[in-house]
Design a protein with these regions (language model features):
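Small-residue hotspots at the loop-to-helix junctions and early N-terminal turns
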Residues: 1-2, 6, 76-81, 138
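Alpha-helical transmembrane segments of multi-pass membrane transport and lipid-handling proteins
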Residues: 11, 38-91, 121-129
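Membrane-interfacial segments
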Residues: 23-26, 63-71, 131-135, 159-164
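Helix-loop junctions and terminal segments of transmembrane helices
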Residues: 4-42, 97-102
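Helix-capping/transition residues at the boundaries of transmembrane alpha-helices
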Residues: 23, 101, 109, 127-129
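Interfacial helix-capping/hinge residues at the ends of transmembrane alpha-helices
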Residues: 19-20, 61, 94-98, 124
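Membrane-interface helix-loop junctions in multi-pass transport and translocation proteins
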Residues: 106-107, 114-167
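Residue-level recognition of pore/gate-forming positions within transmembrane alpha-helices
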Residues: 2-5, 40, 53, 62, ...
Length: 167
């Protein structure tokens, strides 16, 4: 969680400053600039996140042993790798969410997104119920994040004319 929080803080510093420009360009009915900013921020945040997450994922066992010594809990390395991979998709979700805020039509998007988030708990429970390894709890979170991405794409397509293939 600490690794995830540190990287997410860095990525937030990329995404958050773009929000006023995206909202202003949408309010000015400049959809071309809105999408250009959204795509650029999505690509930049995802690239930076991936550039930090990949070496951490590769060397996670060394990092954990250096940080925690010999008392690294079982499954920790896989939990971290899955969360890093999950948050790579989160870098794509956040800029789409900004566009939805700019439209002012949040009800549909929030309904889809909230339903997706609520899905993670029963999905994780089912994974554990059928005897899956603990890492599958984090796979449930990954599925939720991908579902949130699709919820954002569907919403922006419906309310802001985003082409599915453009994103």
């Amino acid at each position: 969680n600490q690794v995830n929080s540190a990287i997410n803080g860095f990525i937030a510093n990329i995404i958050i400053p773009s929000r006023p420009q995206v909202i202003q360009s949408y309010a000015n009915d400049d959809l071309q600039r809105t999408w250009r900013l959204t795509f650029s921020v999505s690509k930049l945040a995802t690239l930076f996140f991936f550039m930090m997450a990949l070496p951490i994922s590769i060397e996670i066992n060394y990092i954990l042993n250096f940080w925690l010594g010999e008392s690294v809990p079982e499954h920790t390395s896989w939990f971290i790798v899955i969360m890093l991979f999950t948050n790579t998709f989160g870098c794509l979700v956040s800029p789409i969410s900004t566009v939805m805020h700019a439209t002012g039509k949040m009800k549909f998007y929030q309904s889809l997104s909230s339903a997706s988030n609520l899905l993670s708990v029963p999905l994780a429970y089912v994974f554990l119920l059928i005897g899956a390894i603990p890492e599958f709890v984090f796979v449930a979170l990954f599925i939720t994040m991908v579902t949130n991405l699709f919820a954002g794409l569907i919403s922006t397509h419906k309310y802001a004319n985003l082409s599915y293939w453009a994103y």
